[in-house]
Structures are given as C-alpha cells and as structure tokens.
C-alpha cells in the first residue's frame, strides 16, 4: 500500500542521514485524546535527552517519563508502562510498569535498543487514544555535520 511505501522511503532517508544509528517508532497508547497521544509521542520523540540516550544504547525510562511530563498531555506517572522491542519482534521488554521500574535485567533492556530499528511502547493507561511517531537518535556526527562554522560565511545560510 502507498502509506507503507512512503513510510519505508522516509525511514531509508533517515538511515542515510547525517550519522543516525537508530530509527525509533514510538507507539503511544492509552491517552485521553488523540491530541494527548500526539503531544506525548512528539515530546518523547523530539527530546534531546531521549535521543542521546538512544544513541548511547541506554533504555533510560527516566528521560522518557521526563519528556512525557513536560508534554501538554495528561500523564499520571503511576500508571505509565514503558517497553521496547526490536522492530521485527512482538516481544516487549518492559522497563517500567505502572510507573515502577521492572526487574528486567539491564542487558536485556539494552539489547532491545541496539542500533538499527526498534519500537518504543508507551501506555499512559488513561484512555483509548493512540498515536505513532517515527524518530531517530542524536549522534556526535549529526551535531558535527549541522553545527555550522562561524569562520565560513557560506555556512550561515543552511
């Protein structure tokens, strides 16, 4: 279908772009409204701290909770579930359930966010609205490529 083809092309562009090592699909469920689902997913997917933890292979649920907290979405920390899975697997590795860290081995959590593609599953457990956002990690190569050069006036335009 056309949507699938467009999504795969967008992911290919991401994989080819400026030092990206991970493509992440954020699946947000259990929001009170579509607007909340969108706001929460965007907040996580656009968070510099979350993106850098992805690059480091760190399944840092604290940064995800932080990003959810400053989104415009209604979030009750004690209800949030967070899990990761390989994009080609339906097996979710939970790092947080009902706002509490799981006893999942750290190595298993790290394996779920290895380079390539993975899915991040966040359930706010408040309602029925869902959202999906595609994001990428933030690497030194990306920063170096985009930082500009104040000694080169040509870099000021882009």
Can you name each region flagged by the protein language model?
Residues 1-56:
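A glycine- and small/hydrophobic-rich beta-loop-beta segment
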Residues 10, 39-158:
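Internal helix-turn-beta structural module
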């Amino acid at each position: 279908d056309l949507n699938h083809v467009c999504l795969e092309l967008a992911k290919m562009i991401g994989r080819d772009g400026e030092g990206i090592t991970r493509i992440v699909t954020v699946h947000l469920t259990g929001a009170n409204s579509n607007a909340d689902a969108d706001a929460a997913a965007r907040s996580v997917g656009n968070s510099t701290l979350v993106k850098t933890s992805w690059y480091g292979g760190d399944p840092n649920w604290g940064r995800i909770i932080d990003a959810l907290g400053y989104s415009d979405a209604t979030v009750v920390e004690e209800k949030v579930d967070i899990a990761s899975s390989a994009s080609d697997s339906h097996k979710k590795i939970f790092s947080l359930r009902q706002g509490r860290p799981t006893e999942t081995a750290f190595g298993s959590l790290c394996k779920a966010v290895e380079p390539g593609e993975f899915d991040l599953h966040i359930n706010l457990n408040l309602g029925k609205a869902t959202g999906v956002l595609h994001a990428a990690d933030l690497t030194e190569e990306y920063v170096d490529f985009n930082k500009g050069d104040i000694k080169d006036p040509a870099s000021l335009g882009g």
